[in-house]
Design a protein with these regions (language model features):
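Catalytic histidine neighborhood in serine/cysteine hydrolases
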Residues: 184-208
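Short beta-strand/loop motif that positions the catalytic acidic residue
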Residues: 157, 163-165
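Catalytic active-site module of serine/aspartate enzymes centered on a nucleophile-bearing elbow/loop
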Residues: 211-235
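Hydrophobic beta-strand scaffold residues
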Residues: 71-72, 161, 192
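Alpha/beta-hydrolase-fold catalytic nucleophile elbow
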Residues: 142-145, 164, 197-198
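Serine-hydrolase catalytic machinery in alpha/beta-hydrolase-like enzymes
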Residues: 4-117, 204-209
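Conserved alpha/beta-hydrolase "acid-adjacent" motif
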Residues: 170-179
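Primarily recognizes the serine-hydrolase "nucleophile elbow" in alpha/beta-hydrolase
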Residues: 107-158
Length: 235
């Protein structure tokens, strides 16, 4: 079930933001692309409810690209991000039009397009990554302040997974994240890295307050951990 935390500190969307470019179709979806076409490894960044035009998300894409990756930020919301001010579409109603299962299926289309480009290894970060991690389609994932994920989901993970949790999180509280770690530690076949960031809330890595030095520092640390995980498992 969606938590109000998933909507805190909404971004001011910018369709022209970022150092990369927007294309009308990548794997059948409009997408923001960053990085070199000559890269051999790719990363898919999957947005939260506010979509692929979020400025911080595109900044993250640009920084991941600087580490040698071809980065895709698909518009899984099809031009319909959640708008808190729209009283006609409260979050539960909006979610019915954008079920995570749909994003999972469309992510597989993006993975197929990356393979057609010759990418030898593919990682993903953001929403639905745990579902992707249950398949053989992807080589590494990073779950940032994960949403509705269960212990049973984690038991099905087949690829290296990093879980970066928040101390203040109603959707995946620290107690649950620690259970995830216990499950992963018992599975010697799946590499894992689990970390709980103190003093931050769900969504902090992409919807932090730029005027909050501690929040900015934590978001930077989460990005460094994300890139390090991909460097370790995709290159």
């Amino acid at each position: 079930m969606a938590s109000s935390q998933c909507c805190d500190n909404p971004p001011a969307l910018n369709p022209t933001g970022g150092e990369g470019k927007v294309v009308d179709s990548f794997g059948g979806l409009k997408a923001y692309l960053a990085g070199s076409n000559d890269a051999k490894a790719a990363v898919i960044l999957i947005s939260d409810v506010f979509g692929f035009e979020a400025p911080n998300l595109r900044k993250i894409a640009d920084k991941v690209a600087l580490s040698g990756y071809f980065v895709v930020v698909p518009d899984f919301l099809h031009g319909d991000p959640y708008v808190p001010e729209n009283a006609e579409k409260p979050l539960p109603v909006w979610m019915k039009s954008h079920p995570p299962k749909m994003g999972f299926q469309e992510a597989k289309q993006v993975i197929a397009a990356l393979k057609e480009k010759g990418m030898s290894s593919i990682g993903a970060a953001g929403m639905v990554v745990v579902e992707l991690a249950k398949t053989q389609e992807i080589q590494a994932v990073v779950a940032l302040h994960p949403g509705p994920v269960t212990v049973e989901d984690i038991k099905e993970v087949k690829c290296p997974i990093s879980i970066l949790g928040a101390e203040i999180d109603q959707m995946s509280p620290p107690e649950l994240v620690k259970q995830f770690e216990q499950v992963l530690s018992a599975n010697s076949e799946v590499a894992h890295f689990v970390k709980i960031f103190p003093g931050v809330a769900h969504g902090w890595s992409v919807r932090y307050n730029h005027d909050d030095a501690a929040a900015v520092k934590s978001a930077k640390e989460a990005l460094e951990d994300t890139i390090n995980w991909f460097n370790k498992n995709l290159k």
